[in-house]
C-alpha cells in the first residue's frame, strides 16, 4: 500500500514527521483529505485548523494548528504552522475558555484545540 510522507512543523519546534495513509484538515477554501499520490498543491490553513493524520495500525494523530500553510508535492505533505499542539498536550478547560475570548485569534486557537480533543466538530 502506498504511504504518504508527512512533516508538520511549527515556528518553535518540529511537531511530527512520519508516514500516513490519509491526512485531513481545513483550508481557507474548504476541507481537504489527502491520500498518497495526491496532485501537488499549496493551500492556506484556517486559523482554527485541526489536522488528523491516519496511520496504518496506529491511533490517529490529532493536532491543533494555528494558521499556516499546507504543501503537497510528489514527496509528500508539509504543514508549516504558526503554532501546533498534539491532542495530548491540550488542557480542554483552558481551550474552552480561550474559545470564548473576544480576541478573534485567541478564540480561533481555542476552537482548534477543542477540535483536536474532539470536544467540537
Curated annotation (Swiss-Prot):
Coiled coil: none annotated. SUPFAM superfamilies: Epsilon subunit of F1F0-ATP synthase N-terminal domain. One of its GO terms (cellular component) is proton-transporting ATP synthase complex. It is found in: Cell membrane. One of its GO terms (molecular function) is proton-transporting ATP synthase activity, rotational mechanism. InterPro entries: ATP_synth_F1_dsu/esu, ATP_synth_F1_dsu/esu_N, ATPsynth_dsu/esu_N. It is a peripheral membrane protein. One of its GO terms (biological process) is proton motive force-driven ATP synthesis. Keywords: ATP synthesis, Cell membrane, CF(1), Hydrogen ion transport, Ion transport, Membrane, Transport. CDD domains: F1-ATPase_delta. F-type ATPases have 2 components, CF(1) - the catalytic core - and CF(0) - the membrane proton channel. CF(1) has five subunits: alpha(3), beta(3), gamma(1), delta(1), epsilon(1). CF(0) has three main subunits: a, b and c. Produces ATP from ADP in the presence of a proton gradient across the membrane. Belongs to the ATPase epsilon chain family. Was identified as a high-confidence drug target. This is ATP synthase epsilon chain. It comes from Mycobacterium tuberculosis (strain ATCC 25618 / H37Rv). The gene is atpC.
